[in-house]
Amino acid sequence: MPTGARAALVIALIYLFLVGVSSLEAGIKIMGADTQERLFSAVSNPIAGLCVGILGTVLVQSSSASTSVIVGLVASGALGVEQAVPMVMGANIGTTVTNTLVSLGHVRQSAEFKRAFAAATVHDFFNVLAVSILLPIELIFKPISGIAKWISELLVGSGGTEWKSPVKKWVKEPVGWLKDLWDQFGASGNVKGALMVATGLVIVLIALALVTKNMKALVAARIERSLNAILGKAGGLVALLVGIIVTIAVQSSSITTSILIPLSAAGVLTLRNAYPVTLGANVGTTITALLAALAASSPDSLTVALAHTTFNVIGILSLYALPFFREVPVIAATAMAEIAVRRRVLAVCYVFGMFIVAPLIGVAILR
């Protein structure tokens, strides 16, 4: 496909994504407060919310998709900002499963697998460390949601000002068509709301998958050729910026971090060069939720999207910028890779335990 045509397709897919977010919001509003309360009763506990964020992201293999859904839920009033913030933190952890799974593809070659698994799990350990430190602070003092709310009010006006979405009118008509479609099938009330939610979710997932695929075709091949040359000469700050820019370009932190795995496995990219790129990917991936917030009708949805960005920026400033904390994920990932090389089955157990079993237990106990 010609480059110009593919770029136009990406723009159309982003529009489709916004339609999906608005459909999700409209469906939840139709379902009503009682249904919403039952639907989200399992996430009233912040730790349960964290676990739901992990599981939801693992399920759809995209933190962009899961945080966009969370933004839609907040916009509809089904979820409060306090409930949503732990969820987006969980999404940060859940998204790292992709590059960890990619690293398992090198399992037959010990030296390659050791380097690949370390490069993958350094992202896991940083995100877990960030959540372990910042979630308790957020629950007590609320600095993340406070900063996000302050920025949100600067952008849309002080409290009490009606939030007028700049893209709402662009997606209003297609959402109306979806409502009319389900009306023709005789759906009403909660059934219609559930169908709108399901339709919106399908649209969001399909649109994001196609955006990712086409953006990768546009830019990722060039990125893979030049990334190591850039990072080999640059310090952590430039690597961080590369992670942000690449992730915004391809609309997927998983692609950015997964590109690093074969480079690390081959020994052409060091763990310390790969590490800051993954942190930049954390920040870059939040652009999707910010975009979703533009299609929502509530200032709280923008607050949650900004909270995701704020959390990642604070995590980098407070952990990566400090030499002691910066080394913790590197040391942990290196040690985990040593263990995984000696007992490869433990690598598989780690993936299931970290991303599925532990979150499921958390939800089951704390709901």
Residue spans of the language-model regions?
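Membrane-interface segments at loop-to-transmembrane junctions
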Residues: 39-44, 113-125, 225-238, 267-268, ...
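Membrane-interfacial helix-loop connectors
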Residues: 57-92, 104-107, 153-164, 246-313
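Alpha-helical transmembrane segments in multi-pass membrane proteins
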Residues: 13, 17, 21, 45, ...
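Hydrophobic alpha-helical segments of integral membrane proteins
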Residues: 24-39, 43, 70, 143-159, ...
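Long, highly hydrophobic alpha-helical transmembrane signal-anchor segments
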Residues: 53, 57-60, 68, 168-193, ...
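Alpha-helical transmembrane segments of integral membrane proteins
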Residues: 3-13, 86, 118, 194-201, ...
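Helix-loop-helix hairpins and the membrane-proximal interhelical loops
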Residues: 1-50, 178-240
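Juxtamembrane and boundary regions of transmembrane helices in multi-pass small-molecule transporters
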Residues: 18, 101-169, 202-209, 213-214, ...
